[in-house]
Amino acid sequence: MINNKSKYTNLIKSEAKRLGFLSCGISKAGFLEAEAPRLENWLNKQMNGQMSYMENHFDKRLNPTLLVDDAKSVISLLLNYYPSEIQNTNSYKISKYAYGQDYHFVIKEKLTALLHFIQTEIGEVSGRAFVDSAPVLDKAWAAKSGLGWIGKNSNLLTKQVGSFYFIAELIIDLDLEYDNPTTDHCGSCTACIDACPTDAIVAPYIVDGSKCISYFTIELKENIPTEMKGKFNDWAFGCDVCQDVCPWNKFSKPHNEPLFNPNPEVLSFTKKDWEEITEEIFKKTFKDSAVKRTKIGGLKRNINFLKD
């Protein structure tokens, strides 16, 4: 006879798949002991740059039971965003995750639907949905639940589909069956370390966030340091270099989420189009996109830095 834990686990994983998630793994909620010294060391070395929010909620980042009362399980989910088409080659580049609609809203809707399903099918279950704007170590939880391993570029990797996916969590007060971590398959490969244009991967598995092109083009609010001149390889919003060169991403398959399909302008814009972008065109093109985070001023700053 199937036990309830197994039954509920299978129900949840089946519904996650129906909602379009690539995969679903489950871990027992608790303190992430191995992550505590890593996070502390990373912050002490100021690898978060001006991302001061990374210093907030230190204890909550490591322990989901402080985020959700009586938390029992962390459900980790992956949502593919690998596009079927990429930008015009004569263009300033934006990270592939920003081609379509802002993932925060797309994922939150799916997580809300999954939680509603759990409450309808199983009963009184409390929980919270988390996308990457919340203090949850999403990659650590995804790795703990066997969805992949954390690679030398600090991204979650899988043998089946590489790393072009979003990670999200649902933390609930229900005991479930838990998955086991997988093994690291980076081996002796250093492709990501060798390819990083700004040497942000300072050691295997350690990324200095304050040296990353994504940090400079999205998080940094002041002028980009002049010593970075000529190193950005035309990246105007984010950077995919360490993922593009990863051998496991040869197995990436296009997503099937219509909301992640790009606005045609995103693919067709030339450098001239980007350089001449107006507030009106910016708002029209990126009104539902993660690119709006930089605002028109931030995007123009990035383009001027690349152009000069």
UniProtKB/Swiss-Prot annotation:
- Molecular function, one GO term: 4 iron, 4 sulfur cluster binding
Residues bound to [4Fe-4S] cluster 1: C186, C189, C192, C246
Q: Where in the cell is it found?
A: Cytoplasm
Looking at the keywords, is Magnesium present? Answer: no
Q: What class of enzyme is it?
A: oxidoreductase
BP terms from Gene Ontology = queuosine biosynthetic process; tRNA modification
Enzyme Commission numbers on file: 1.17.99.6
User: Which protein family is it in?
Assistant: Belongs to the QueG family.
The protein's name in its UniProt record: Epoxyqueuosine reductase
What is the native source organism of this protein? Flavobacterium psychrophilum (strain ATCC 49511 / DSM 21280 / CIP 103535 / JIP02/86)
